[in-house]
């Protein structure tokens, strides 16, 4: 598994996939990433973080869960790297349930600016509930944007519509400085890919949005070089 990538295109940065202590939510119907966990993830993470050079001053960290689920040794090493490599911007991912802990978490890495992305997946509350995302139906895009600067959107599962995909993109553009569009790839879960929907997106939507600097499009899980 590749866990380090240097991204030169949109939002140039170093991108690392660390191992967490286990996703605390672990209920999303489409996700099996939570299997990437161990009781001593620092053994994996130390080798990954030692590859960070600080080339762009931006470090993006994901861990198949939420940043708050990283072990303490790993968090301390990230703090050291921020200082040693002069990292001025850090990105982390977190579930919405951690929203009120983000500010305190960010203080650990001062003076770096810390930004967070949330795996919202969709703003369609019925679909979000079906996917068991754990974000209440009453939560609005404005609510999410109070805590998170970026989001991840998922598309291409059976039962979605073209209108739903376009609406999600429209909302994300309005409220967030960054978002990724992730095509669903069949995995070990019960969710199944809608190949025709992804083909439509690739042919008709992708050409219109591919140059937007705020949007990263992943047609495969490994398109950013990790996984």
Model regions and ranges:
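Short amphipathic alpha-helix with an adjacent loop that forms part of the alpha/beta core around
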Residues: 47-52, 104-107
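Distinct, well-ordered alpha-helical segments
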Residues: 70-79, 99-109, 162-165
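Conserved C-terminal portion of the radical SAM core fold
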Residues: 137-193, 201-224
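N-terminal pre-core extensions flanking Radical SAM catalytic domains
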Residues: 3-7, 27-30, 214, 218-227
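Canonical Radical SAM [4Fe-4S] cluster-binding loop centered on the CxxxCxxC motif
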Residues: 2-44
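Core AdoMet radical
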Residues: 33-47, 55-72, 82-100, 113-138, ...
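A conserved mid-domain beta-alpha-beta active-site/ligand-binding segment of alpha/beta enzyme cores
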Residues: 196
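Short, conserved loop/helix-junction motifs that constitute active-site signature segments
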Residues: 83-86, 107-111, 145-146, 173-175
């Amino acid at each position: 598994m590749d866990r380090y990538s240097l991204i030169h295109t949109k939002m140039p940065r170093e991108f690392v996939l660390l191992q967490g202590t286990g996703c605390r939510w672990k209920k999303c119907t489409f996700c099996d990433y939570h299997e990437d966990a161990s009781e001593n993830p620092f053994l994996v993470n130390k080798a990954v973080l030692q590859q960070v050079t600080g080339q762009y001053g931006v470090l993006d960290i994901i861990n198949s869960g939420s940043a708050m689920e990283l072990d303490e040794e790993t968090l301390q090493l990230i703090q050291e790297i921020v200082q040693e490599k002069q990292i001025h911007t850090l990105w982390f991912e977190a579930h919405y349930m951690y929203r009120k802990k983000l500010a305190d978490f960010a203080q650990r890495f001062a003076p770096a600016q810390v930004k967070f992305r949330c795996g919202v997946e969709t703003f369609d509350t019925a679909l979000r509930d079906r996917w068991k995302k754990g974000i209440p139906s009453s939560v609005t895009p404005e609510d999410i944007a109070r805590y998170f600067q970026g989001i991840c959107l998922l598309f291409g599962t059976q039962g979605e519509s073209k209108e739903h995909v376009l609406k999600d993109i429209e909302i994300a553009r309005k409220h967030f400085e960054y978002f990724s569009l992730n095509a669903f790839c069949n995995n070990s879960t019960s969710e199944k890919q809608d190949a025709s929907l992804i083909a439509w997106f690739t042919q008709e939507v992708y050409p219109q949005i591919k140059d937007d600097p705020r949007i990263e499009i992943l047609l495969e899980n490994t398109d950013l070089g990790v996984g």
